[in-house]
Amino acid sequence: SEESNLCDLLRDYDKPAQEVIAEMTDGGVDR
């Protein structure tokens, strides 16, 4: 599924997942 692919991508990513998500969602999960 797309969601598990995203998790794999984040696992390989250099930045913390939250930072990546914040960039992709243009603001982040906490706002």
From Swiss-Prot:
- This entry's Enzyme Commission designation comes to 1.1.1.1
Which species is this record about? Answer: Catharanthus roseus (Madagascar periwinkle)
Q: How is the cofactor bound?
A: Binds 2 Zn(2+) ions per subunit.
**What's a single GO CC term here?**
cytoplasm
- This chain's protein is named Alcohol dehydrogenase 1
Which reactions appear under catalytic activity for this entry? a primary alcohol + NAD(+) = an aldehyde + NADH + H(+); a secondary alcohol + NAD(+) = a ketone + NADH + H(+)
Q: Indicate the enzyme's highest-level EC class.
A: oxidoreductase
Sequence positions that bind Zn(2+): 7
Q: Where in the cell is it found?
A: Cytoplasm
Which cofactors does the annotated protein need, by name? Zn(2+)
Under the subunit heading, UniProt states:
Homodimer.
Decide whether keyword Membrane is in the record. no
Q: Which UniProt keywords are present, listed alphabetically?
A: Cytoplasm, Metal-binding, NAD, Oxidoreductase, Zinc
Q: Could you say which protein family the record assigns here?
A: Belongs to the zinc-containing alcohol dehydrogenase family. Class-P subfamily.
